[in-house]
């Protein structure tokens, strides 16, 4: 049986904007309360109706297809907004009309009765969320891992499954409408320009991220990068105890090459990352706060060390694809902003970089230092090619390719023994691909075709 939620009951007219992954989860959740349901979606009527029948069966759901209108949505008492919806003017108008506007985190907040770990940042949040989940499971805890990755939080609430800890990846889009969401442990990994097409500028993007801390109390824990000036700014923080992690001497969770350490229960604990998938600069910075979180939730040090040793990285994040004639090929398709690309380049020495795609408003001049220090050839693809060329052509040799296949072929022709060919786009994928996973899979196929040709 669903826990009572002050935002929804049988007398509520509950609307959902956008029937994507989060919207479907919201509909499944709302069906359990017997509310009057409205759905507004951009897809055509036939496709939307098929989705509603599949999800709601015989339950009557009023809907509008082909867009979102004030006239339809203003009937609602409460509106659930999917993270991808960006019409702030419409939402403001609905609020003025007395409609409550909520995101997933705000809707779930009143009924969360287990410790919640919420992880955000421009880069690394998926890896760290997965790692925290693995470390907690290694200690025998029942864990839900989801949010912006995998299973939506509302599906956990619908299921009634009992867990000990909830671990969530949360995005800036979700945090904009977080309401009274208050995680017991909140982690901000890093901040660099991203989604500026949505947030307007870096200040707007940072403000969305800082919602993570605003409702925390004195018994909660806030963990932020001690190396990132944007994370260190205290404005927007709540009342939680704050811990810094990183290479900085001021860090409470101290990171160094191949290991990290922190004080716990009066003892200095040292954790080695040697021979693990996390033994690189990015991995050190990911593992340190993850282990501190697990330790803060009463996991044993030995269990944490076992979880770190067993951890494997997800696809499309600095994923080794092949070694061909002494050249290493890496798929980093998940790198959709400049910060992620810089992090990838810092792990390599002589790089042929494939970058480009759909621009998200990023400043590609931020890549100049890392490109000058690590990249000997840049191959640009996609709509952002002119922007990348303008920002970088005076610090690196630049080529243009009309397809990813052409880019891989060019990279292979330029590469010499000891080089690395890296797909790390700094852009969204939607100009040429279905998503970043599709882009990464196509890159992998092209590279493996090179390997097949070379073996004949």
Swiss-Prot record:
Its EC number is 6.3.2.9. It catalyses: UDP-N-acetyl-alpha-D-muramoyl-L-alanine + D-glutamate + ATP = UDP-N-acetyl-alpha-D-muramoyl-L-alanyl-D-glutamate + ADP + phosphate + H(+). Belongs to the MurCDEF family. NCBIfam families: murD. Cell wall formation. Catalyzes the addition of glutamate to the nucleotide precursor UDP-N-acetylmuramoyl-L-alanine (UMA). PANTHER family: UDP-N-ACETYLMURAMOYLALANINE--D-GLUTAMATE LIGASE. It is found in: Cytoplasm. The keyword Zinc-finger does not apply. GO terms for cellular component: cytoplasm. It is an enzyme of class 6 (ligase). The lineage of its organism: Bacteria, Pseudomonadati, Thermodesulfobacteriota, Desulfobulbia, Desulfobulbales. Pathway: Cell wall biogenesis; peptidoglycan biosynthesis. GO terms for molecular function: ATP binding; UDP-N-acetylmuramoylalanine-D-glutamate ligase activity. Pfam families: Mur_ligase_C (PF02875), Mur_ligase_M (PF08245), MurD-like_N (PF21799). Keywords: ATP-binding, Cell cycle, Cell division, Cell shape, Cell wall biogenesis/degradation, Cytoplasm, Ligase, Nucleotide-binding, Peptidoglycan synthesis. One of its GO terms (biological process) is cell wall organization. This is UDP-N-acetylmuramoylalanine--D-glutamate ligase.
């Amino acid at each position: 049986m669903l826990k009572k939620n002050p935002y929804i009951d049988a007398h509520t007219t509950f609307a959902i904007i956008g029937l994507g992954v989060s919207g479907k989860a919201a509909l499944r959740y709302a069906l359990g309360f017997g509310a009057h349901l409205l759905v507004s979606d951009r897809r055509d009527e036939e496709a939307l109706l098929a989705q509603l029948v599949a999800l709601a069966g015989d339950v009557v759901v009023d809907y509008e297809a082909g867009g979102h209108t004030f006239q339809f949505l203003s009937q609602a008492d409460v509106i659930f907004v999917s993270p991808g919806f960006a019409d702030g003017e419409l939402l403001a108008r609905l609020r003025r009309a007395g409609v409550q506007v909520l995101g997933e985190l705000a809707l779930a907040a009143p009924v969360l009765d287990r410790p919640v770990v919420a992880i955000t940042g421009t880069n690394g949040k998926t890896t760290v969320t997965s790692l925290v989940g693995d470390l907690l499971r290694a200690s025998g805890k029942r864990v839900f891992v989801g949010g912006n990755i995998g299973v939506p939080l509302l599906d956990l609430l619908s299921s009634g499954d009992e867990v000990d800890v909830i671990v969530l990846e949360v995005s800036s889009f979700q945090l904009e409408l977080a309401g009274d969401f208050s995680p017991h442990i909140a982690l901000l990994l890093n901040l660099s320009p991203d989604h500026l097409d949505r947030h307007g500028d870096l200040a707007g993007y940072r403000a969305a991220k800082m919602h993570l801390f605003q409702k925390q109390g004195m018994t909660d824990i806030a963990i932020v990068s001690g190396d990132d000036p944007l994370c260190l700014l205290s404005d927007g923080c709540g009342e939680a105890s704050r811990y810094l992690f990183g290479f900085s001497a001021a860090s409470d969770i101290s990171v160094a090459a191949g290991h990290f350490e922190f004080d716990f229960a009066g003892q200095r604990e040292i954790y080695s990352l040697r021979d693990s998938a996390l033994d690189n600069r990015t991995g050190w910075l990911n593992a340190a706060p993850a282990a501190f979180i697990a330790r803060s939730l009463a996991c044993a040090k030995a269990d944490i060390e076992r979880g770190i040793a067993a951890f494997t990285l997800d696809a499309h994040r600095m994923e080794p694809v092949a070694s061909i004639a002494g050249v290493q090929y890496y798929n980093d398709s998940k790198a959709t902003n400049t910060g992620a690309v810089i992090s990838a380049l810092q792990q390599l020495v002589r790089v042929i970089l494939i970058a480009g795609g759909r621009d998200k408003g990023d400043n590609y001049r931020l890549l100049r230092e890392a490109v000058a220090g690590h990249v000997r050839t840049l191959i640009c693809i996609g709509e952002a090619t002119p922007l990348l060329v303008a920002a970088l052509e005076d610090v690196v040799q630049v080529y243009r390719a009309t397809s990813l296949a052409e880019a891989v072929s060019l990279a292979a022709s330029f590469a010499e023994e000891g080089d690395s060919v890296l797909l790390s786009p700094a852009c969204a994928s939607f100009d040429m691909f279905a998503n970043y996973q599709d882009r990464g899979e196509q890159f992998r196929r092209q590279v493996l075709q090179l390997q097949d040709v070379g073996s004949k």
